[in-house]
Curated annotation (Swiss-Prot):
Positions of post-translational N-acetylalanine modification: 2
Protein name: Rabenosyn-5
Membrane-topology descriptor: Lipid-anchor
Spans annotated as Necessary for interaction with RAB4A: 264-500
Superkingdom of the source species: Eukaryota
Coiled coil regions, renumbered to chain: 378-414, 472-531
Molecular functions per Gene Ontology: phosphatidylinositol-3-phosphate binding; small GTPase binding; zinc ion binding
Regions of compositional bias (Polar residues) in chain numbering: 207-224, 579-598
Composition skew (Basic and acidic residues), residue ranges: 390-400
Gene name, Swiss-Prot/TrEMBL: RBSN
Record text on subunit structure and interactions: Interacts with EHD1, RAB4A, RAB5A, RAB14, RAB22A, RAB24 and VPS45. Binds simultaneously to RAB4A and RAB5A in vitro. Interacts with RAB4A and RAB5A that has been activated by GTP binding.
Gene Ontology cellular-component annotations: cytosol; early endosome; early endosome membrane; endosome; endosome membrane; extracellular exosome; intracellular membrane-bounded organelle; plasma membrane
Ranges annotated as biased composition (Acidic residues): 663-673, 722-732
Amino acid sequence: MASLDDPGEVREGFLCPLCLKDLQSFYQLHSHYEEEHSGEDRDVKGQIKSLVQKAKKAKDRLLKREGDDRAESGTQGYESFSYGGVDPYMWEPQELGAVRSHLSDFKKHRAARIDHYVVEVNKLIIRLEKLTAFDRTNTESAKIRAIEKSVVPWVNDQDVPFCPDCGNKFSIRNRRHHCRLCGSIMCKKCMELISLPLANKLTSASKESLSTHTSPSQSPNSVHGSRRGSISSMSSVSSVLDEKDDDRIRCCTHCKDTLLKREQQIDEKEHTPDIVKLYEKLRLCMEKVDQKAPEYIRMAASLNAGETTYSLEHASDLRVEVQKVYELIDALSKKILTLGLNQDPPPHPSNLRLQRMIRYSATLFVQEKLLGLMSLPTKEQFEELKKKRKEEMERKRAVERQAALESQRRLEERQSGLASRAANGEVASLRRGPAPLRKAEGWLPLSGGQGQSEDSDPLLQQIHNITSFIRQAKAAGRMDEVRTLQENLRQLQDEYDQQQTEKAIELSRRQAEEEDLQREQLQMLRERELEREREQFRVASLHTRTRSLDFREIGPFQLEPSREPRTHLAYALDLGSSPVPSSTAPKTPSLSSTQPTRVWSGPPAVGQERLPQSSMPQQHEGPSLNPFDEEDLSSPMEEATTGPPAAGVSLDPSARILKEYNPFEEEDEEEEAVAGNPFIQPDSPAPNPFSEEDEHPQQRLSSPLVPGNPFEEPTCINPFEMDSDSGPEAEEPIEEELLLQQIDNIKAYIFDAKQCGRLDEVEVLTENLRELKHTLAKQKGGTD
């Protein structure tokens, strides 16, 4: 056995990289290195760490390959009995119960098994490499035997009396044979032989694998020696000699099985199945179709449109090429579908299912792409299409020229309009904002506010430039540049259309907002006006009802029973009195009732006032509209001297002009303030047929303001007092139509007061209605 100082020596086992001490396991080697060499150079430690990581990766790859083998062998049996005729996907979701993780135990057993397998394989590869490292043909048998004993220690013959495999007893006829790889003893029947080509194959594959993962710092000529074969590569490195003889290496059954499994892994790594080769060809054909089909579709669309960008012959050749590729795809997919069906061991069901799915996918691909291929026109059809295309282009150019002329004309008109407005001094108003957009014209102005032509748009200029570039590229025959420019032109056109659409949408939105704002303002004005009119109507209606229909305030006069009905009716029909404010309506007596009679010499009643002399002639300027007005004008003048003096009141001039309130007509705000003063007569005579007006206002300057009554004598001003010599014959009957009309009005007022919740007014109006009905019934009885 060579010494340790020999640079060509190959040692096996778990050797320390620093002291070359042989440890028995990987864990002992790791603990030895951490304890004995923890303070040494960290570079060597980094190299060892990288070596260990590589070994773990190689070990994982090996285990993955073995797991795939076991999965393939057990898939069929699992599919046959695991489900038991029940589809687990139809099960209801179940809640998880108690969970216990066995991952730690699994990792422990798995690591031990992997370590055992990897270590055993590495040992066998290293020993096999040593046995084939010398020339066995030119070496003496004694020297070969000595080398074989030096590779692995042999077991003593006396320790094994029987064969461990078959149990036969060793004798002179049944000799003992030692395994050259593990040193165990077996008989001739249980002995296996390894040929040199197989040994060279295993060692060469291990050498290639090691050369891929070995770090540059480690080499066979290292001072401390080298470890051929490691956990990371599952092999070792050795110099392989080309053996040409038929000599073989003896080994046991266990070592032979391990080496054969290693050979199977190498073959699987280098072997490519037939289905994979066919599928790779199929994918290449599909990729070729994906490249050629869009180009052909683009050429066919251009030729069918009558364009001369592409050649008809070139498109026909491309179509034939694409069709051939489709035929090849169909043939390859059929071959994959029938692959292995005639073999004696039939393929696995999963392989058959994979083949069917590949065929189905290829069929769908061909159908999808083949249906999208457009047919090419014939030469005669292509000539006709070119003529139509030429005519269409000419019409389009004519339309474009017409549009350009129209745009130029609009620009000139706009400029002339600007010049004329500038002469008239209107340029400042034009500069305040942009010109309004007319959608019918088909253009949009810029945000600067000045009218500009469509050609001033940068996008339009760029579109025109690219159009000219396309024409030049077509003339030069640069089809690739033509396609690029056409794509750019389409993008610019889309951008221009989007810009115009956004501007139109923004303009429409602004117009809609302005219209909504105007509509809201108009609605607010209408609501305010309606609210004002309602308030005026409510106040004036309340004043009119409480002043003209309050019959309970006649009590202070205490007239005779024979004259009471006429007096009440005359007061009820006195519509010429002015309304009073609503706050004092039920408490303040009316003007006609508070004024003293002409025969009363006492002081004036509360609230009795007299207007100034200057305002009296203005009260009766217009002619009276009352058909019952008396013609005798002497009585008011005679009675004016007997009336008591009234306290003068200084009133605002605006309060002297009053228009009679009509609940069915609208009034202004100015009239509402005047209508609330009980001491101001209206400017014009009231259109009340029961009010008496004097045609000569100059004769009543000193008399109190008492409205005329059509039921009193010309010599009497007070409607509640009559002469003693006048009897019942002096009464004039009231027209029945007027009484009925007043009754209907009071009913309407009662209904409105009930709706508004004015109960005090309801009581007053109800009593007045009762008295009017009584008067009407009495008058009808007297007439009858």
